[in-house]
């Protein structure tokens, strides 16, 4: 799936939102802090959502 291979993008803003991204190198969904703007689609509000889309 294309979005699951996109890199983690924190973005330049400072909102400090806890999100999850799929790490295609390890095959796992991992937490990260998202700034709140200019991210990509490899950015999920929950671990469950990340695993559901990327099958981790």
From Swiss-Prot:
The record marks 14-15 as: Reactive bond for trypsin. InterPro entries: Kunitz_BPTI, Kunitz_BPTI_sf, Prtase_inh_Kunz-CS, TFPI/VKTCI-like. Negative results: does not bind to and, hence, probably does not inhibit serine proteases plasmin, kallikrein and thrombin. Has no or weak activity on hKv1.2/KCNA2 (IC(50)=52 uM), rKv1.4/KCNA4 and rKv1.5/KCNA5. Its main location: secreted. SMART domains: KU. It comes from Radianthus crispa (Leathery sea anemone). One of its GO terms (cellular component) is extracellular space. Contains 3 disulfide bonds. Residues 4-54 form the BPTI/Kunitz inhibitor domain. One of its GO terms (molecular function) is potassium channel regulator activity. Dual-function toxin that inhibits both serine proteases and voltage-gated potassium channels. Has potent activity on both trypsin (Ki=28 nM) and chymotrypsin (Kd=1.8 nM). Shows inhibitory activity against 4 of the 7 potassium channels tested (rKv1.1/KCNA1; IC(50)=142.6 nM, hKv1.3/KCNA3; IC(50)=40.7 nM, rKv1.6/KCNA6; IC(50)=154.9 nM and drosophila Shaker; IC(50)=433.1 nM). Has an anti-inflammatory effect in LPS-activated macrophages in vitro, specifically reducing release of TNF and IL6 but not nitric oxide and reducing expression of IL1B precursor. Gene3D superfamilies: Pancreatic trypsin inhibitor Kunitz domain (4.10.410.10). This is PI-stichotoxin-Hcr2f. Keywords: Disulfide bond, Ion channel impairing toxin, Nematocyst, Potassium channel impairing toxin, Protease inhibitor, Secreted, Serine protease inhibitor, Toxin, Voltage-gated potassium channel impairing toxin. Belongs to the venom Kunitz-type family. Sea anemone type 2 potassium channel toxin subfamily. Disulfide bonds join 4-54, 13-37, 29-50.
């Amino acid at each position: 799936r294309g979005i699951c291979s996109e890199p983690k993008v924190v973005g330049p803003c400072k909102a400090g939102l806890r999100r999850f991204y799929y790490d295609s190198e390890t095959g796992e969904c991992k937490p990260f802090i998202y700034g709140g703007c200019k991210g990509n689609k490899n950015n999920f509000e929950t671990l469950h959502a990340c695993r559901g889309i990327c099958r981790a």
